[in-house]
Amino acid sequence: MNTESLVAALSQNNVKLARTLLLANLLEETQGKNSWDCPHYTADRAVQESIALCEANNDRMTYFGLENLRDRYFLRDANDAICENPQTFFARVATGMARGDRAFAQELYDYMSKGWFIPATPVLMNIGTSKGLCISCFLNTVPDTLEGIFDIYRENAFLAKFGGGIGTDWSQLRGQNAPLKSSGLRSSGVIPFLKIMDSETLAISRNSHRRGAAAAYLRIDHPDIEDFLEIRKPTGGDMDRKCLNINHGVVITDAFMEAVEARQPYKLVCPHTGTITKELDAMEIWRKLLTMRAETGEPYFLYIDTVNRSIPPHHKELRLLVRQSNLCTEIVLPTTNDRTA
């Protein structure tokens, strides 16, 4: 492809011409190549070769779709050159998902190639390879021990490295200035540990295509909730207590919302001892929540009692509880100190 021609087409807002030029370049660049030229390829080559490709479906692709696939998703060979084009890419993903079923692989390919269906990003990037996970979201909870906290840091680092978005519940940690029996000192609270999570998230690149992403969750009745609400606010306060690289969500209880409706105070409770540490004006905290949402788009809201009333019977029989949600607050699964969902 003539790069000058592509630049000229884009500068003239001729996106259709730019798409044609980009597609021609991709097909020329990958001529004689296929997914299995990637050293990480692990899919069933025989199944992939059996898929009947429809090159005419390339015309369904937009310029921006092609550019995104080329930049993020197509596999590369040992020389870091692209070895997939749109149709071989869809065939590789379909093969990985079909697990040896040729008819199903063909059906999946047809759906994706026609634009009827597309899997999540980790599937597109990793399936049929040894590069990473095909799971988008993970949920875990942090125990109130130093060992447990740093175990979570390690787990989150590898989950982010291999393509996962993470939702971590920090509500078990005792609040700031709570006594520590083992040392006779007092706890630094949740926020300094979130600062480490914030730096870790910035440092870990998710599959080298985008930064690792994580959300921290804290109960509305946690002693550190007031500071937690402001960790994403870029102005005011101590920057050592800001966490601008992670998302955050508040786990809201029925008791809090009832206090808001009744214009009454509500209690902050130490998760370690169960003692009441403070009372706050529920309506003022609710206003602060809404103000932060208006200013920063966060925190997320998770109405935890509503969720736990609706969990499946087999979870209830095992006495499992949902503590938080995932990075995007659309998945709710039970977690424990030794169970990552």
What are these regions (language model features)?
Residues 1-341:
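Extended catalytic cores of very large enzyme megasubunits
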